[in-house]
Amino acid sequence: MNSFFKSLRSSSSRELDHPRVTTTLSKQGADIVVHNPSANHNNKEVLQRAMDSSKGKILMNNTGTSSLGTYESDQISESESYDLSARMIVDTNHHISSWKNDLFVGNGDKAATKIIKIHPTWDSRKQYMMISRIVIWICPTIADPDGKLAVALIDPNKSVNARTVLKGQGSIKDPICFVFYLNWSIPKVNNTSENCVQLHLLCDQVYKKDVSFASVMYSWTKEFCDSPRADLDKSCMIIPINRAIRAKSQAFIEACKLIIPKGNSEKQIRRQLAELSANLEKSVEEEENVTDNKIEISFDNEI
């Protein structure tokens, strides 16, 4: 008997937290309107609670009635004080990809080319994905490089003359970083090896064919969403990297890797922050205990 009353209390509390709302349709002229009558609760608060229990960030917008599409040539709209974007949750789980390592190889006296397909794993049930940022870092691996470099973001589905979406130019004399900011999302059906966006690299460095003259590392940020997104701007930022900047110890490198924690649980992030702190302390100790072991080279005893 006690268990019976407990179940009644638990069910009533669930109804208070997530009350049922009856949705009705009515036709007003050529339009079909969706009515969500308010019960003894606030619709926005219910929606907010439902979103707060999900992972990801919430995009709220209170601009008024939203178009839901058409049904049998009639326009369907929703008579709510919030629009569809209020229901869109951007899933940021595992959204930063790991660094991919590749090589840029020579082509003899001809310009060297390389194509990288940006084809992320679709590890979400949501129907749209936005690759909001692509970072590509190119570092020369030979002495005295002098090649000019061009990196272009290509949409292979456009006409030949319109395929270049963004482009940046520089030199491989020093390490260089290109950051592409994208402003559109793609449906799941388009995320294929044939249809995905590509990075095209072109360098006029003269080097033996099929022998590497530079290292290419790249990564991207992806965000999944239920509705398609279209941001305002797209751009390419070029960042030359000073040769004097280098990691002095393995501990420092490990600390840098942990600056952006992976995962969402508190336990995961706390563990990674503890490792970050430990590696930074170890790096400082190593730097303080460094002895000068440089080998002196001279031409006094030439043979």
Swiss-Prot record:
Residues 60-72 have a biased composition (Polar residues). The keyword Ribonucleoprotein does not apply. Belongs to the tospovirus movement protein family. Oligomerizes to form tubule structures through host plasmodesma. Interacts with host A.thaliana At4g26020 protein, which is involved in antra- and inter-cellular trafficking. GO terms for cellular component: host cell plasmodesma. One of its GO terms (biological process) is transport of virus in host, cell to cell. It is found in: Host cell junction, Host plasmodesma. Residues 1-20, 52-72 are annotated as: Disordered. It comes from Impatiens necrotic spot virus (INSV). This is Movement protein. Keywords: Host cell junction, Host-virus interaction, Transport, Viral movement protein. Viral movemement protein which is responsible for cell-to cell spread of viral genome. Increases the size exclusion limit (SEL) of plasmodesmata by forming tubules structures, thereby allowing viral ribonucleocapsids to spread directly to neighboring cells. Coiled coil: none annotated. Transmembrane segments: none annotated. Its main location: host cell. Disulfide bonds: none annotated. Residues 1-11 have a biased composition (Low complexity).
